[in-house]
C-alpha cells in the first residue's frame, strides 16, 4: 500500500494545533489506513485530502482515527479523527482510496451470444474503485459461458456480462 507521504506531512503542518508537533498523529493515520485496507484485491494507493484550515480544535495529546458508521474504505470517502487524550472533539478528513488490480479487458467489440476466446481480451491493471463490482480478474469464470450482452472494446469484462451457454 502506498500513502502519499507528502500528504501526511501537509496534513500535519495544517493541523499542527490538533496534536503536539509530532509524527505520532501521522503514524496513527498511516497505521489505521494500512490496517483498514489490508486484504483488498490489489495494489492500494491512498490520497489524503487537505483539511479545512479554518478548523482549529483545541490541542490534543493523541489523535485517534476511526471509520464513520456508513463509510467504507473504497474510492472517495472520509475517515474520522477524534481527540483521545485531551479536549473532546472530532473531525473528518477526506481520503481517496485507489485499488489497482489486473482485470480482463475486451480487445475489440464483443457480440452477445459468443463464447470468450483468448484473443478477445487482454489483462490490464485498472483502478477497481472507478468501476462497478464484479469485474473479471480470472478468465476461468467465462469457461462454458457466453456473452449475455455486447461489450465494447477497451471495457472491462464483468460477471453479469456472461450467462451459461445454451445446450442443444
PLM regions: where:
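Mature, extracytoplasmic segments of signal peptide-bearing proteins
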Residues: 2-3, 17-168
